[in-house]
């Protein structure tokens, strides 16, 4: 850790730890309200003044990431604009030349920087930040920690009543509590333009989320444009303009990478697949009534070899397109009625000795899909239904707990069985309610279940989910933010950070900060933002 910054004579304060309100640092409304709260914060009363004309963000001379690290260079430019975005250049010299100034922020990467890599579950997001005259130093082992530290530094800078940029001398040491901190978006119920996804990724970076769970297809539409099976989107999308082309996917992946965000695609099956059947013949199960075939189709047909040939080829493509180690396979809400009505399925189950136990049929199918993913050297995530239905899961399969009933008990059962878990049950943001529902999201504690320390280490994080039945590009951003910010702090900050009133004060400022950066985050309650008149800029 770097040494403590200089203290102004006679003004020495005890270090302000994370639980203490930052209102002491600056007047309310101008305070550098940190969100999410870092693991360790020391803020001192000595103010440094910043001249936008002279201030620089640059690589430290001995950093392993040099001037060729385009990820960092782009981040330096981006955060300079975030900090000084509404600044109007003065004519003439700055008025505080005789006062202590901060002239630079130097960024030092200690290990292999990973400038050209994609982030992963094991990426190191830790960093330390020392702010003192005349140069601040941001240290990180990898570029991912530097990105998180740049966000924190930007939140420390504020403007006084005269428009002067200032920052308090500070020392911060920080790292995330959980490695998986996600936002789920749904692009099947409503297509989301790529620009809207970009805006979501921006806001995620402001809140230190690191996973975009992309629920890309579902019953309603199939907007993913497959190279191998183009008819899936040609016939399954809402229209030929409501698709994500290979170039669209590439742009989203790169935009996310530059912000230290992983993109995990979800291709849910055997249920939630009605749109698949429009472009892939004989994939879905024909439904019968009294042994007469109807026009209706049900889940994927698990009895046909052609089903697994298709998925083997399809997931080979997905494994090439999406670089992340994980693919989400869904597996939720499988309806057995259509399978039960189909004579071919009945005969298949007899041959396999499944009797009338359709959970065994589901298990047979899911295991085949899991084997395909494993053969591609990828790992799987499934919804809790797969675990609840006693499907035989491979070691390391991640179970996402989404059902609100007894979700803590579910976490206990999943982890007791040795499987990693992701929690999303208390964070379904599509379930809107009047008032400050963010407080309920904030109070949800992922590890508040009875279990051993080993079990709790298997909880790798959580996700805020915004399903798309009533959400499109017109309301996605204000419905997500700042409500998802509460989840962001719960997943990043130490468990002891629980004070709601302190959180409200900081989140109100953070919400205004997001507004100033072009994120149309809805208000927490009554009040105002300094930059509201410039939202459209």
UniProtKB/Swiss-Prot annotation:
It comes from the Eukaryota. Keywords: Cytoplasmic vesicle, Disulfide bond, Glycoprotein, Glycosidase, Hydrolase, Lipid metabolism, Lysosome, Signal. Transmembrane segments: none annotated. Addition of GM2A stimulates the hydrolysis of sulfated glycosphingolipid SM2 and the ganglioside GM2. One of its GO terms (cellular component) is membrane. Gene3D superfamilies: Chitobiase/beta-hexosaminidase domain 2-like (3.30.379.10), Glycosidases (3.20.20.80). Its EC number is 3.2.1.52. Belongs to the glycosyl hydrolase 20 family. Hydrolyzes the non-reducing end N-acetyl-D-hexosamine and/or sulfated N-acetyl-D-hexosamine of glycoconjugates, such as the oligosaccharide moieties from proteins and neutral glycolipids, or from certain mucopolysaccharides. The isozyme B does not hydrolyze each of these substrates, however hydrolyzes efficiently neutral oligosaccharide. Only the isozyme A is responsible for the degradation of GM2 gangliosides in the presence of GM2A. During fertilization is responsible, at least in part, for the zona block to polyspermy. This is Beta-hexosaminidase subunit beta. It comes from Rattus norvegicus. The lineage of its organism: Eukaryota, Metazoa, Chordata, Craniata, Vertebrata.
């Amino acid at each position: 850790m770097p040494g403590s910054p200089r203290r102004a004579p006679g003004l020495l304060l005890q270090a302000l730890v994370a639980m203490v309100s930052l209102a002491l640092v600056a007047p309310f409304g101008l305070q550098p309200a940190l969100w999410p709260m870092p693991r360790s914060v020391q803020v001192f009363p000595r103010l440094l003044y910043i001249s936008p004309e002279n201030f620089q963000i640059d690589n430290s001379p001995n950093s392993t990431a040099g001037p060729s690290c385009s990820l960092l260079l782009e981040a330096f430019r981006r955060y300079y604009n975030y900090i000084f975005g509404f600044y109007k250049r003065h004519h003439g010299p700055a008025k505080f030349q005789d006062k202590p100034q901060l002239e630079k922020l130097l960024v030092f990467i200690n290990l292999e920087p990973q400038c050209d890599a994609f982030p992963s579950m094991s990426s190191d997001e830790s960093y330390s930040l020392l702010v003192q005259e005349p140069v601040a130093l941001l240290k990180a082992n990898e570029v991912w920690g530097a990105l998180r530290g740049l966000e924190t530094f930007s939140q420390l800078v504020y403007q006084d009543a005269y428009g002067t940029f200032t920052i308090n001398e500070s020392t911060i040491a920080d790292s995330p509590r959980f490695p998986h901190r996600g936002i789920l978006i749904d692009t099947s119920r409503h297509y989301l333009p790529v620009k809207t996804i970009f805006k979501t990724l921006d806001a995620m970076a402001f809140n230190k989320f690191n996973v975009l769970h992309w629920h890309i297809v579902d019953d309603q539409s199939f907007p993913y444009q497959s190279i191998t099976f183009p008819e899936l989107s040609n016939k399954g999308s809402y229209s030929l303009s409501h698709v994500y082309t290979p170039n669209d996917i590439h742009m989203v992946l790169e935009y996310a990478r530059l912000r230290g965000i992983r993109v995990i695609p979800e291709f849910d099956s055997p249920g939630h697949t009605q749109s698949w059947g429009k472009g892939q013949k004989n994939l879905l199960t024909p439904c019968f009534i009294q042994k007469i075939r109807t026009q209706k189709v049900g889940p994927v047909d698990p009895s046909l070899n052609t089903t697994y040939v298709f998925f083997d080829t399809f997931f080979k493509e997905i494994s090439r397109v999406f670089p992340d180690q994980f693919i989400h396979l869904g597996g939720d809400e499988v309806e057995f009625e259509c399978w039960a009505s189909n004579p071919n399925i009945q005969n298949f189950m007899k041959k396999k000795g499944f009797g009338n136990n359709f959970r065994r049929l589901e298990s047979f199918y899911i295991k085949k899909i899991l084997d395909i993913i494993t053969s591609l050297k990828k790992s799987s995530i499934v919804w809790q239904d797969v675990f609840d239905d006693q499907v035989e899961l491979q070691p390391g399969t991640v179970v996402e707990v989404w059902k609100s009933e007894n979700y803590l008990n579910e976490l206990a059962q999943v982890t007791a069985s040795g499987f990693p878990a992701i929690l999303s049950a208390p964070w379904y943001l599509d379930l809107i309610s009047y008032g400050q529902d963010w407080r309920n999201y904030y109070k949800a504690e992922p590890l508040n279940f009875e279990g051993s320390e080993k079990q709790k280490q298997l909880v790798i994080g959580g996700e805020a989910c915004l399903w798309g039945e009533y959400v499109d590009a017109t309301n996605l951003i204000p419905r997500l933010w700042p409500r998802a910010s509460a989840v962001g702090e719960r997943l990043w900050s130490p468990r002891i950070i629980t004070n709601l009133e302190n959180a409200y004060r900081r989140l109100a400022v953070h919400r205004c900060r997001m507004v100033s950066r072009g994120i149309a985050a809805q208000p927490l309650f009554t009040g105002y933002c300094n930059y509201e008149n410039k939202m459209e800029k």
